[in-house]
Amino acid sequence: MKALLVGDLSPTAKSNPLFAAKDIDGLFSKDAKKLFEGNDINFVNLEVALTDIENGIKKFGPCLKASGGTADVLKSLGVTVCGLSNNHIFDFGRQGVADTLSHLERVGLPYTGYGKNYEDSRKNYFVEKNGERVCLIAVCEHEYSYAEGDFEGSRPFDCYDTLEDIRSAKEEADCVIVLYHGGKEHCRYPSPRLVKTCRAMVKAGADLVLCQHTHIIGCYEQFGGGHILYGQGNFHFAGHSDKDGESWNQFLATLYDTETHEIEFLPMVNDGPKIKLAEGEEKEKILKGLRERSALGEEGWYEGFKNACHTDFAWYVKAIGYEGASEHDFHLLAHYLDCEAHHDILSELFKTAHQKKENY
């Protein structure tokens, strides 16, 4: 089968009126629309609640919502399945999700990566054609939206359950594609943990792992017979902010042949509230950057990740909770984060609003 897999879609203040008006031509260039033709699978990560609710949940970060017309646009565009495993689908609580699912069901658009409880969220999504079976697994890191126990939410990545889910899927399908929503935002390089995680998923049976969420194009590697893209960039987050630089406005559409396992990355760019395929020098510049970063390998990726972390040092120091923290305090915090048992204790003592079920 032929699959088109694209990243995060979230209408912005500039593009939402066009989504509400179902103005496909105002949102997608001709070449962008053509990408969706002739494929068996067209996947997009719907990173927004389609709702009119005013008040978002208690969280750090923005609450994203958009017009229900977004569902109509995606259906008309040719999207065949939406991924809902991300950190914004629950921004307006259960009612916001209910509204979103209602709009998707209204236009007949399937979704994956969300469930009425944790076990339900783990349902795999299969596509069958001419005797071939492909499985899509959409998972996210733990950031406000995830399912837990009997509570609804996105399908979270779990270092035990997800790998088992991939192994089970491989027994039932010819090809397994994992959409992993995670990684450090605005960083082109994967952390050592993310590299290990993605490689483990390939070892478990994934043929392709696409990391989304970071809003920026990262690095690529072939590993163990599989493909891993550490950072696909957005899909339609056009006009998010006038301050957004070049990195935010460039992204990759992924074309993948599930039988031959051939893969192609197609650079795309924002053009006001519209997106289009990159051409000429701009296209080559994007691909050249991807090749150069990918060639750095693990050591180079770690240096890039480490440098990005240090630029955010002051931000994370705030989490300690007081000014004048000493070197001893930093070492103590590092010890608590490093040791599994201490990490368990911290997680039990200090819970987010999501974990406390305050957003339900």
Regions found by a protein language model. Name each.
Residues I53-K75, C175-D207:
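Active-site-proximal segments of metal-dependent phosphoesterases and phosphodiesterases across multiple
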Residues G78-V81, P192-F251:
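Conserved beta-sheet core of the metallophosphoesterase superfamily
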Residues P17, E246-Y360:
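A short C-terminal boundary segment appended to hydrolase-like catalytic domains
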Residues M1-S85, G93:
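N-terminal catalytic scaffold of extracellular/periplasmic and nuclease hydrolases
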Residues N39-T51, I166-Y189:
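Short acidic, glycine-rich surface-loop motifs adjacent to enzyme active sites
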Residues T12-K14, L50-I53, N87-L101, Y118-K123, ...:
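Active-site environment of divalent metal-dependent phosphoester hydrolases
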Residues L5-G7, N42-E47, L77-N87, P110-G115, ...:
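Active-site neighborhood of phospho(di)ester-bond hydrolases with catalytic His/Asp-centered motifs
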Residues K14-K30, L64-K65, N124, E128-V176, ...:
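Binuclear metal-dependent hydrolase catalytic cores centered on His/Asp/Glu-rich metal-binding motifs
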